């Protein structure tokens, strides 16, 4: 092997550079463009042209010696297009990009492809997922696909248009030439039409279709500020079947599908909310003359505060409508989170339909959305004009705070306000509501108590309340089509959504849980705050993930949240935690899924703090009166006398007809005597124990035994044993059949069991806390523990020590 040296490495680099320069000479580019290319750009362009040559070399040759058109004529047609042509594989590798791209994006073809050989290198990163979904969506090869994305533009063009350019792409896949590479990477050919803010006027009466109609099905229209049709192109006859004269001076809303009225009105409001040259997009259904419905993708442009509104209308299929509407909803939601301005925030939450819904010309209303058949014809609803409906969310609506929603009416008929008249399957903007901030399908309202001045003194000025729903990315909801709440706004569903928020009790107003959605910057005006009264006894338990709609809720839930403020209005205004963002980005925080109670219900709050191993505090919670203390001492003496009497065996009469067995035990056998030593088999020491006095729960008069039954017990126990005294006589003779006493002949296992049994605490001792706190008496009343030092001749113990 040859050893590498410095000279040999330099020779190899020179050889590689020479080959790259040879590739540059082979590129079909102008000399001015070749001079500006670097080695990396040359290699990227070489890959693109190589793929292009291989693909077109395997295609079918054109009919005739030169085809239908010459090469120059083809170049002239491509240059005259109101867009540019783009060819790339399913994995995004570029094959061709027309030279006319420089007129629309500001970059020349060489500049764009020099950035990389993939389409993802020349489009906005936010649209990578959209393009990837379109390229991987299964369909027939000859099926057209329509989607929109933003292309990167030059710095000079970005300064003029304030961002990347939005482009509408329509194309299809082609049959691949033979080869393993092309079998897995079909080629997609697309025509890209930039969505110009000012469409190019066409010849003839009315707004002309322009050259774009040669590649994109479209018609143009011009409207007044209320969207009344001022003019429309003649090509509307092809797509809707109406003559131009039939539509002039008519309201554009008269052609809309009822389920798309809310979507169109919200976009119309956005277009009128700001002055200047802005645009709005919508995907709606327009009624054709034959009675059917046609999906239309509309681009609306405003020519200033006094000028008309111009619209480009693109007929699309059901699948394209579903894809575009889903993309619009996603972009509007992201813009609402990041910008937080009224011009960008959608004024209602738009539903995203599936492709199965789009295949049906009439969508099924979503959950909680009133159907057209269920609208009550109440006189108080009336007919609301478009101007009145748009005037309700006025420009004074400021998203630096979250207003308190109005109290709903008790019936569904009263709940359907003016804004809900025309909204299946969407919910229009409600003044004071902000459910659209959290991507919900409908805003709910709940019965909430009026503000309280007592809580205003406890809560900080930046604390307000709102009853809107904050839905985590992990929360699941039942199918709206199978739910029993279909087509209705019910109070139970509203409260079930509200219960998923993390509440705070008013017992500790200065301790707020970190799972509440809070917003950092100070409020613009403290007058917008609305507070909720405290809740004296509150106990909240979060539902499990499977129980999305709980059946029973707390009777009067009161929850406190924080206000939305400023640009980064989704940050927590709590002390920082490991999960809190700190880089200043606008991020939506998901709610913490807690699986336990958020508060502990203390029935009687003691005066001192409940701390582990606390020192004894003032004994003011439980106190015995003098009478109760005397009764306790008397009961202790009676129990001790009863225990002393148990040292003597029961008589036959006492065992059968005297005391009844305690706790369901069977009476003692009169033929069985407990012979042996007087003291018990096991010497057990009494343990000191504490217990919480429960005299406040039970009637004190029923706690003690009457004197007469106790005296009867003592008289029965004092009856002499007919069989003699303890320990007298032969055990064999006393017990019939020669049965030994169970107290003398115990197996080691029985002794071990008795020892374990003696060490167990009673049920009452086990339920009592071992930590002293206020409410426990530090005076312990118990039996005196003293070992018997003398016994009588009969085997009984000494005199009672009480």
Curated annotation (Swiss-Prot):
Residues 1-13 are annotated as: Basic motif. One of its GO terms (biological process) is positive regulation of transcription by RNA polymerase II. Transmembrane segments: none annotated. Residues 472-495, 502-518, 527-555 have a biased composition (Polar residues). Residues 280-319 form the PAC domain. One of its GO terms (molecular function) is DNA-binding transcription activator activity, RNA polymerase II-specific. Specifically expressed in neurons. Expressed in the lateral nucleus of the amygdala (at protein level). Induction: Expression is regulated by neuronal activity. Induced in excitatory neurons specifically upon calcium influx. Induced in the lateral nucleus of the amygdala in a learning-dependent manner (at protein level). Its main location: nucleus. Residues 14-53 are annotated as: Helix-loop-helix motif. Residues 70-144, 203-275 form the PAS domain. Residues 1-53 form the bHLH domain. GO terms for cellular component: cytosol; nucleoplasm; nucleus; postsynapse; transcription regulator complex. It is found in: Nucleus. Ubiquitinated, leading to degradation by the proteosome. SMART domains: PAS (SM00091). It comes from the Eukaryota. Keywords: Activator, Coiled coil, Differentiation, DNA-binding, Neurogenesis, Nucleus, Repeat, Transcription, Transcription regulation, Ubl conjugation. Residues 5-38, 624-648 form a coiled coil. Residues 472-555 are annotated as: Disordered. Efficient DNA binding requires dimerization with another bHLH protein. Heterodimer; forms a heterodimer with ARNT, ARNT2 or BMAL1. Transcription factor expressed in neurons of the brain that regulates the excitatory-inhibitory balance within neural circuits and is required for contextual memory in the hippocampus. Plays a key role in the structural and functional plasticity of neurons. This is Neuronal PAS domain-containing protein 4. It comes from Rattus norvegicus (Rat). The gene is Npas4.
């Amino acid at each position: 092997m040859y050893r590498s040296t410095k000279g040999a490495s330099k020779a190899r680099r020179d050889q590689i550079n020479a080959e790259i320069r040879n590739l540059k000479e082979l590129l079909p580019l102008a000399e001015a463009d070749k001079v500006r290319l670097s080695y990396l750009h040359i290699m990227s362009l070489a890959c693109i042209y190589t793929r292009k040559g291989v693909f077109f070399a395997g295609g079918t040759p054109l009919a005739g010696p030169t085809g239908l058109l010459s090469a120059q004529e083809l170049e002239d047609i491509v240059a005259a297009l109101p867009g540019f042509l783009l060819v790339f594989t399913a994995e995004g590798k570029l094959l061709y990009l027309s030279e006319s791209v420089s007129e629309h994006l500001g970059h020349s073809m060489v500049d764009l492809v020099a950035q990389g050989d993939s389409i993802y290198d020349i489009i906005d990163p936010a649209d990578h997922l959209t393009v990837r979904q379109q390229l991987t969506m299964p369909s027939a090869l000859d099926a057209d696909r329509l989607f929109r994305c933003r292309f990167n533009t030059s710095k000079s063009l970005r300064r003029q248009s304030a961002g990347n350019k939005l482009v509408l792409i329509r194309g299809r896949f082609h049959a691949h030439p033979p080869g393993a590479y092309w079998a897995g990477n079909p080629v997609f050919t697309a025509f890209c039409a930039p969505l110009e803010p000012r469409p190019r006027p066409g010849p003839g009466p009315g707004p002309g279709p322009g050259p774009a109609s040669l590649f994109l099905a479209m018609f143009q229209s011009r409207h007044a500020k209320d969207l009344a049709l001022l003019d429309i192109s003649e090509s509307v006859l092809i797509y809707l079947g109406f003559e131009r004269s039939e539509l002039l001076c008519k309201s554009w809303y008269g052609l809309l599908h009822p389920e798309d009225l809310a979507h169109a009105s919200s976009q119309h409001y956005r277009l009128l909310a700001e002055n200047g040259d802005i645009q709005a997009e919508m995907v709606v259904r327009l009624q054709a003359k034959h009675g059917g419905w046609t999906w239309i993708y509309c681009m609306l442009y405003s020519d200033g505060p006094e000028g008309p509104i111009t619209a480009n209308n693109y007929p699309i299929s059901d699948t394209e409508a579903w894809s575009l509407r889903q993309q619009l909803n996603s972009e509007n939601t992201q813009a609402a989170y990041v910008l937080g301005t009224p011009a960008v925030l959608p004024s209602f939450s738009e539903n995203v339909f599936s492709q199965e819904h789009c295949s049906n010309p009439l969508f099924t209303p979503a959950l909680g959305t009133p159907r057209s058949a269920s609208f009550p014809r109440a006189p108080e609803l009336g007919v609301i004009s478009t101007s009145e409906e748009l005037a309700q969310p006025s420009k004074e609506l400021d998203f630096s705070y979250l207003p308190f929603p109005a109290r709903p009416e008790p019936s569904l008929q009263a709940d359907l306000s003016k804004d809900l008249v025309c909204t299946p399957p969407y919910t229009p903007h409600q003044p004071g509501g902000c459910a659209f901030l959290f991507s919900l399908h409908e805003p709910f309202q709940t019965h909430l108590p009026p503000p309280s001045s007592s809580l205003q003194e406890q809560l900080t000025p930046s604390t307000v309340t709102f009853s809107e729903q904050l839905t985590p990315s992990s929360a699941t909801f039942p199918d709206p089509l199978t739910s029993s709440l279909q087509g209705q706004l019910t109070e139970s569903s509203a409260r079930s959504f509200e219960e998923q928020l993390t509440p705070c009790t008013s017992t500790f107003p200065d301790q707020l849980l970190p799972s509440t959605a809070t917003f950092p910057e100070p409020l613009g005006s403290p007058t917008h705050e609305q507070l909720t009264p405290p809740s004296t006894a509150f106990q909240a338990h979060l539902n499990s993930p499977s129980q999305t709609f709980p059946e029973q809720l707390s009777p009067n839930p009161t929850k406190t949240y924080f206000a939305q403020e400023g640009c980064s209005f989704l940050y927590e205004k709590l002390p920082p935690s490991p999960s809190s963002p700190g880089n200043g980005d606008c991020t939506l925080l998901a709610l913490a899924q807690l699986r336990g109670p958020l508060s502990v219900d203390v029935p009687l709050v003691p005066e001192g703090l409940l701390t582990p191993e606390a020192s004894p505090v003032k004994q003011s919670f439980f106190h015995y009166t003098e009478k109760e203390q005397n009764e306790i001492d008397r009961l202790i003496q009676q129990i001790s006398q009863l225990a002393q009497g148990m040292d003597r065996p029961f008589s036959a009469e006492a065992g059968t007809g005297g005391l009844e067995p305690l706790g369901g035990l069977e009476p003692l056998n009169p033929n069985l005597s407990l012979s042996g030593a007087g003291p018990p088999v096991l010497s057990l020491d009494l343990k000191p124990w504490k217990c919480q006095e429960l005299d406040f729960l039970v009637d004190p008069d029923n706690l003690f035994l009457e004197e007469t039954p106790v005296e009867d017990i003592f008289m029965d126990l004092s009856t002499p044993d007919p069989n003699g005294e303890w320990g007298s006589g032969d055990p064999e003779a006393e017990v019939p059949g020669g049965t030994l006493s169970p107290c003398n002949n115990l197996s080691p296992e029985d002794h071990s069991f008795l020892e374990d049994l003696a060490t167990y605490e009673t049920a009452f001792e086990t339920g009592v806390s071992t930590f002293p706190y206020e409410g426990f008496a530090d005076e312990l009343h118990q039996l005196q523990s003293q070992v018997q030092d003398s016994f009588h001749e009969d085997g009984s113990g000494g005199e009672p020590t009480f």
